[in-house]
């Protein structure tokens, strides 16, 4: 919510900076659960650190969640403090061609959202049948992140 309110970010700059540092830390290894009677419930909406999981090459396990989280960090100005998020962003930008379209190797299907946090965020186009249709969502999100970071974009 703070990421969407620039005036509040400026007024509470110290708090926003501390929050950015907190959200850039790796998430705890131990699962967080809430005890409700005899049942244990794992909440989907609680962020206890950076939820992005990436392999050695920088590919995220949950691409929509990674893009959503990178966008939030970019809006808050906290992306530089999150090493996993910057590694994933660098990997995604490396998969872009010379005109800026995200074209990874072997894209056979739309990347699946594994976390319920991103249901409202991804995909923009549900019926992507062609390879170009599958690339649109990620390309748009990368362009939005680049714009939030203040990078110049050229329309081709």
Regions found by a protein language model. Give the residues of each.
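Short, solvent-exposed beta-strand-terminating loops
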Residues: 92-113
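An alpha-helical repeat/solenoid feature that recognizes helix-turn-helix modules
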Residues: 1-85, 106-154
